[in-house]
Amino acid sequence: EAKDDLARLLRDYQDAMNVKLALDVEIATYRKLLEGEECRMSGECPSAVSISVVSSSSTTSASAGGFGGGYGGGVGVGGGARSGFGGGSGFGGGSGISGSSGFGGGSGSGFGGGSGFSGSSGFGGGSSGFGSGSGGRSGVSGGGLSSGSSRGGSVRFSQSSQRTSR
């Protein structure tokens, strides 16, 4: 009996950590897509931004501006509209995420305006940060995101050259 309970709790925990990492990736992807929109509108795009996701179960590499890939249990990351991401939620072109807060696509849109996310983390638009507390540690500042979880998953960004000054 106790062994079954422990196994179920471990599965639930691993599922929660997978969802947390997927949400971190989704947040980072949105941030990069929004930055790409802004630079495209202003006409001074930086060089290609790459996003790498490394976890104990799968690896997905992508570059901003239209990409698709599998991650974890059927999770897809995509720059285009109607791509799916985690547990049936979708993003791109103004769809909702995770059933609790909506995100708009297109230039100049942002996270937040007071909306909550994942129970323990909150967002503002622009360069403000957020923190999530489900056994991991993550932070967003400006254009970069670093994430760590007790499962050992991580999110890494690399940018091959600096943005030109305005």
Curated annotation (Swiss-Prot):
Residues 1-41 form the IF rod domain. PROSITE patterns: IF_ROD_1, IF_ROD_2. GO terms for cellular component: intermediate filament. Signal peptide: none annotated. Keywords: Coiled coil, Intermediate filament, Keratin. SUPFAM superfamilies: Intermediate filament protein, coiled coil region. Heterotetramer of two type I and two type II keratins. There are two types of cytoskeletal and microfibrillar keratin: I (acidic; 40-55 kDa) and II (neutral to basic; 56-70 kDa). This is Keratin, type II cytoskeletal 68 kDa, component IB. It comes from Bos taurus (Bovine).
